[in-house]
């Protein structure tokens, strides 16, 4: 069977289309592979930099003790103090003030490079302090809340963040807090208790319903008016004691004696 020219052209186009599509897919897969590999290398490089920074952090802390606050002085090296301790003990030979009549002679220093050593720091300052344990007095901006390490090491917990936001002076309101609490409690005591009386007690049943406007009817008869006034006097409130102490209910065909407040939609048809 011989293929016609049209069939040959169709098969050639079909094969070429799928071949080009396959090459595009392979190219996309290769690009994604390269991107993932570059991203992995970048993450490894960042991880190595972080590890190096963590390893060099103690050295930086030891070097930064020279610029620490005045109360925190770096301790002297221990080997130097051990070597110079006996020399320092022999050099200080004092004469009794009653036996000495004249200017005090200078102390003889047997070692030419000897000089006075500073006083050793207290034992609680011998350990190099952490950077977050420095006092915050040197900082200019006190409106920022403390970091997590400072909040953990603080003797008193920091004020809530709402107080920091409402503070207009830029300082924590630790001193003003008790006065504010007293003033708020006084204001709460001065406020009258809320009244729980129901609404629309002296109005009709349809006063809470928004009905379309209609032509006003004629004036009712005086008997109905007297009955309405009497029902208003009989049921002034919702309390059971007043309901039991009043006269019995006289049913009226045109309105309810006690108005019930209605809000929203009703089920009336």
Swiss-Prot record:
Any single GO BP term: adaptive immune response
Start and end residues of each stretch annotated as Disordered: 63-83, 97-121
Cell compartments where the protein resides: Cell membrane; Postsynaptic cell membrane; Postsynaptic density membrane; Cytoplasm, Perinuclear region
The entry's keywords: Adaptive immunity, Cell membrane, Cell projection, Cytoplasm, Immunity, Lipoprotein, Membrane, Nucleus, Palmitate, Phosphoprotein, Postsynaptic cell membrane, Signal-anchor, Synapse, Transmembrane, Transmembrane helix
Segments for region (Required for internalization): 146-166
GO CC aspect terms: cytosol; dendrite; nucleoplasm; perinuclear region of cytoplasm; plasma membrane; postsynaptic density membrane
Membrane topology qualifier: Single-pass type III membrane protein
Job of this protein: Acts as a synapse-to-nucleus messenger to promote NMDA receptor-mediated excitotoxicity in neurons in a JUN-dependent manner. Inhibits ubiquitination-mediated degradation and promotes phosphorylation and transcriptional activity of transcription factor JUN. Might play a redundant role in the regulation of T cell receptor signaling. Might promote apoptosis in T cells.
Protein name: Proline-rich protein 7
Natural source organism: Mus musculus
Phylogenetic classification of the source organism: Eukaryota, Metazoa, Chordata, Craniata, Vertebrata
